[in-house]
Amino acid sequence: MINKILDLYTRCGKSLLDNGINDAVLPISVANEALALFSEAKWVVLGGDVYQYENDEMKNFYADWYCNLVVPSESCNYAKEHLQKLRGDNIYISFTIKN
């Protein structure tokens, strides 16, 4: 399972190192795939940060969320519901997870 998650980040992810953050983001177009993998791996999604890629840089989209659910499938569903509400071009997501 970890290999599938790492493969998704390798294929689709973008680094936030230029923003001074040691993390990576995924395009919203693969967010549901990531959430399904997290749920299958029994990882709890604690929240996430939302970015918009503009003019060759990641900018905060100010649509971050936090979740205190402890059941992996419930936390992933909460994240999915939040992300479905977002509108905009070039949206990327950074997930905060607990395994």
List the model feature ranges, each with a label.
Residues 17, 43-47, 91-94:
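Residue-level signal for secondary-structure boundary elements
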Residues 34-35:
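Hydrophobic alpha-helical transmembrane segments of integral membrane proteins
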Residues 38-43, 86-90:
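A generic structural signal for short, non-catalytic loop/turn and secondary-structure boundary residues
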Residues 39-79:
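Acidic, low-complexity, intrinsically disordered interaction modules
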Residues 66-99:
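Short, compact, well-ordered microdomains
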